[in-house]
């Protein structure tokens, strides 16, 4: 009798995606982050569901409902901090996943890559609206500053901002709709992730060499299921260590002060995972220019496949491109640091230089160096 997993309509889909899936035999631990992102998403949906059972999306009670979760609900503090730090782990995995794609040329699977960029934008939107929900000072002012950026759009900007706010400032209507968005978006992310996988399984996985591996495939189970479980254990260990030892390490102390529209915090800044984009936004003195640079800093990923000038897909055998790649990583870390600093000398000029270097590396230097490498190899 043929195995049920190969005949049953539902089991067949799961079998072809996670059990009998032909996988390159040489993919490294950098390929673990896809499954880790799936794990993060499941954890965030579960912890978020339990938080939503006790949270009230109302300006007068939101802050105290979060305090109530932490003080009175059984293990509420644990669920809350798992959710908050889970978001940080989500972004760490996300950035590692994108970095892997850039390094090994996975962006040449264009449909998979474009869905991935869409996923990144959706996760960023989810994290942003989620940060507003505790209704602390940084929640309120972060929401005010970021939504206000839309007013830079000519002609319709102001109307658009008031439409998103549901009034003339960030208030009860804004909080209620942000809670609704924060609840629905993870399910949209889940659907997009399924489409992401669908397109990936059309082509099969890339591998570190960037050379097609059709002649050397192994089944996903048990080899990569085991490997993914090990990765998951490390992720859970890191998340638990962060949550149980230093739960507020990555948070902002201002968010322990209830939102007050009459008092502006000294330094308004987003969560750490948005600081690089925030630094690029602030480095341009013009409002519309800043907003466009902010958008382009993320949307530039869509153009990466078009900027591929190398005859080799992966950077594995391209030392000059590797140097530029790690320069880009260092530049992003610099931008992240600058985004958390006050707007004063020397941070302003460092931020501007780092922003220029970011776009210069991606749009000019990397494609040019790839062409030089082709010449050196007489290709």
Curated annotation (Swiss-Prot):
Chain residues that bind heme b b566: 97, 196
Annotated residues for binding of a ubiquinone: 201
Membrane-protein topology: Multi-pass membrane protein
TM region positions: 33-53, 77-98, 113-133, 178-198, 226-246, 288-308, 320-340, 347-367
Keywords, sorted A to Z: Electron transport, Heme, Iron, Membrane, Metal-binding, Mitochondrion, Mitochondrion inner membrane, Respiratory chain, Transmembrane, Transmembrane helix, Transport, Ubiquinone
InterPro entries: Cyt_b/b6_C, Cyt_b/b6_C_sf, Cyt_b/b6_N, Cytb/b6-like_sf, Cytochrome_b, Cytochrome_b_C_euk/bac, Cytochrome_b_N_euk/bac, Di-haem_cyt_TM
GO molecular function: metal ion binding; ubiquinol-cytochrome-c reductase activity
Cofactor(s) demanded: heme b
Sites where the protein binds heme b b562: 83, 182
Principal location listed in the UniProt entry: mitochondrion
Keyword Hydrolase in record: no
Similarity-based family: Belongs to the cytochrome b family.
Function: Component of the ubiquinol-cytochrome c reductase complex (complex III or cytochrome b-c1 complex) that is part of the mitochondrial respiratory chain. The b-c1 complex mediates electron transfer from ubiquinol to cytochrome c. Contributes to the generation of a proton gradient across the mitochondrial membrane that is then used for ATP synthesis.
Protein name: Cytochrome b
Organism: Lagenorhynchus australis
């Amino acid at each position: 009798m043929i195995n049920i997993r190969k005949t049953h309509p539902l089991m067949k889909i799961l079998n072809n995606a996670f059990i009998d899936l032909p996988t390159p035999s040489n993919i490294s631990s950098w390929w673990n982050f896809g499954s880790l992102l799936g794990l993060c998403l499941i954890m965030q949906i579960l912890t978020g569901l339990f938080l939503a059972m006790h949270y009230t999306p109302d300006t007068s009670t939101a802050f105290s409902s979060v305090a109530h979760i932490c003080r009175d609900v059984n293990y509420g503090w644990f669920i809350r901090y798992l959710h908050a730090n889970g978001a940080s782990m989500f972004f760490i995995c996300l950035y590692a996943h994108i970095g892997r794609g850039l390094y090994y040329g996975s962006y040449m699977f264009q449909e998979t890559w474009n869905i991935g960029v869409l996923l990144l934008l959706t996760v960023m939107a989810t994290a942003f609206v989620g940060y507003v929900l505790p209704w602390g000072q940084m929640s309120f002012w972060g929401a005010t500053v970021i939504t206000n950026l839309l007013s830079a759009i000519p002609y319709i900007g102001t109307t658009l901002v008031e439409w998103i706010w549901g009034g003339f400032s960030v208030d009860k209507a804004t909080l209620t709709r942000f809670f609704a968005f924060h609840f629905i978006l993870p399910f949209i992310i889940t659907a997009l992730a399924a489409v992401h996988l669908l397109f990936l399984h059309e082509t099969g996985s890339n591998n570190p060499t960037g050379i097609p591996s059709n002649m050397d495939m192994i089944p996903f189970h048990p080899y990569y299921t085991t490997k993914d479980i090990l990765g998951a254990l490390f992720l859970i260990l890191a998340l638990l260590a962060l949550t149980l030892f230093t739960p507020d390490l990555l948070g902002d102390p201002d968010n322990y002060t209830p939102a007050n529209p009459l008092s502006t915090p000294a330094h308004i800044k987003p969560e750490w995972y948005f600081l690089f984009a925030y630094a690029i936004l602030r480095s341009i003195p013009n409002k519309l220019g800043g907003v466009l640079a902010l958008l382009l800093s993320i949307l530039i990923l869509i153009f990466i496949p078009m900027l591929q000038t190398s005859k080799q897909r992966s950077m594995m055998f391209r030392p000059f491109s590797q140097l530029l790649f790690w320069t880009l990583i260092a530049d992003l870390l610099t931008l992240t640091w600058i985004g958390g600093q006050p707007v004063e000398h020397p941070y302003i000029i460092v931020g501007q230089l780092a922003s220029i270097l970011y776009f210069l590396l991606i749009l000019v230097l990397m494609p040019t160096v790839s062409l030089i490498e082709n010449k050196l190899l007489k290709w």
